[in-house]
UniProtKB/Swiss-Prot annotation:
Pathway: tRNA modification; tRNA-queuosine biosynthesis. The lineage of its organism: Bacteria, Bacillati, Bacillota, Clostridia, Thermoanaerobacterales. Its EC number is 2.4.2.29. It comes from Desulforudis audaxviator (strain MP104C). This is Queuine tRNA-ribosyltransferase. Keywords: Glycosyltransferase, Metal-binding, Queuosine biosynthesis, Transferase, tRNA processing, Zinc. One of its GO terms (molecular function) is tRNA-guanosine(34) queuine transglycosylase activity.
Length: 372
């Protein structure tokens, strides 16, 4: 199966739980936030820096690596871990979301999806089987099935079509997957914001007996209460001994709300994307460091933060770097944002272990005036 997941502690007031995910490249404590390294790199960071910030598992992207440099080249290099000098676990998403959001002129059928590269316009065809083979060539610890992510808003008819196709694709991916190999394969639950579709999707994928389950099709524009409601529909239907992964979600408030409902794994480009646009997480909410009021603020980005940036540099200095277009400005905001989320996940794990998750959640959200 490639992985082993154990629940170590269940919170007494919520569905939050402390877990241990054992993979061929190391052990990961959950709940966990996974930094995103789309192109086999967490933007502006070395692998050692990412690990020193507390990351134990990262995410990379099948669509992008398939197009450039190519999965066969990565295989020749000894696999993705060796290629990018990351010795911890790697999860690769299937590329389905990118095909539907980035690739122009795509054609969808039950067989798979034909698309043109957003890089050079070349024509490609993804099937459920091919996507599994590509991820096995990359050497991922955890691979994701090809799915069809319905947009929001989406009609019930279109959502049903996408959900049923995702289930059929999942069965084909499951059959193609080498379950005796080192790569574990997760199914992806779809269904948009429709309860019956979400529940049908979950039950069908559980019947296929995947090692873990992604919850997809959320954080695509729907109001957050709808996302939280969808989690409440599906999580009770997932076996307790399987990890639950909320895909593409990673703001601090969503971490708390997802974990409270039983989510174990999160990923999101938000910390690195915000950093590139001059914004950072703080304990009172989002701060846009690029904005003029920070030009003469000689305090840290977030008082009390212990990251490298906050220990050495002021808001005024980081503001200056960002305004001047210096790469160091983006590096410093990236370091801070990744530290913020990784340290928050660590604090949440400690709180669950000590059965005080609910109070930590209430305190954090009460202080957060401007959620990301």
């Amino acid at each position: 199966m490639g992985i082993l997941f154990e629940v170590l502690k269940q919170d007494s007031r919520t569905r939050a739980r402390l877990g241990r995910l054992t993979t061929p490249h190391g052990v990961v404590e959950t709940p966990v936030f996974m930094p995103v390294g789309t192109q086999a790199t967490v933007k502006t960071m070395t692998p050692e820096e990412v690990r020193d910030l507390g990351a134990r598992i990262i995410l990379s992207n099948t669509y992008h690596l398939y197009l450039r440099p190519g999965h066969e080249l990565v295989r020749e290099a000894g696999g993705l871990h060796r290629f990018m000098h990351w010795n911890g676990p790697i999860l690769t998403d299937s590329g389905g979301f990118q095909v539907f959001s980035l690739a122009p002129l795509r054609k969808l059928s039950d067989e798979g999806v034909e698309f043109r590269s957003h890089i050079d316009g070349s024509r490609h065809f993804f099937t459920p089987e091919k996507v599994v083979a590509v991820q096995e060539a990359l050497g991922s610890d955890i691979a994701m099935v090809l799915d069809e992510c319905a947009p929001y808003p989406c009609s019930y008819k279109d959502a049903r079509t996408a959900t049923e196709r995702t289930t059929r694709w999942a069965a084909r991916a499951r059959a193609a997957w080498n379950s005796d190999g080192a790569t574990a394969l997760f199914g992806i639950i779809q269904g948009s914001v429709y309860r019956d579709l979400r529940e049908e999707s979950t039950r069908a994928l559980v019947d296929l007996d995947f090692p873990g389950y992604g919850i997809g099709g959320l954080s695509v524009g729907e109001p957050k209460p709808l996302m939280y409601e969808a989690l409440e529909w599906v999580i009770p239907l997932i076996p307790e001994d399987r990890p639950r992964y909320l895909m593409g979600v990673g703001s601090p408030d969503c971490l708390f709300e997802g974990i409270a409902r039983g989510v174990d794994m999160f990923d999101c480009v938000l910390p690195t994307r915000m950093a590139r646009h001059g914004a950072v997480f703080t304990h009172t909410g989002r701060l846009v460091v690029r904005n003029a009021p920070n030009a003469r603020d000689f305090g840290p980005l977030d008082p009390g933060c212990t990251c490298y940036t906050c220990r050495h540099f002021s808001r005024a200095y980081v503001h200056h770097l960002l305004r001047a277009g210096e790469v160091l400005g983006i590096r410093l905001t990236t370091i801070h944002n990744l530290h913020f989320l990784l340290d928050l996940a660590r604090r949440i794990r400690e709180a669950i272990a000590e059965d005080r998750f609910h109070s930590l959640k209430e305190q954090f959200l009460a202080a957060c005036l401007t959620p990301a």
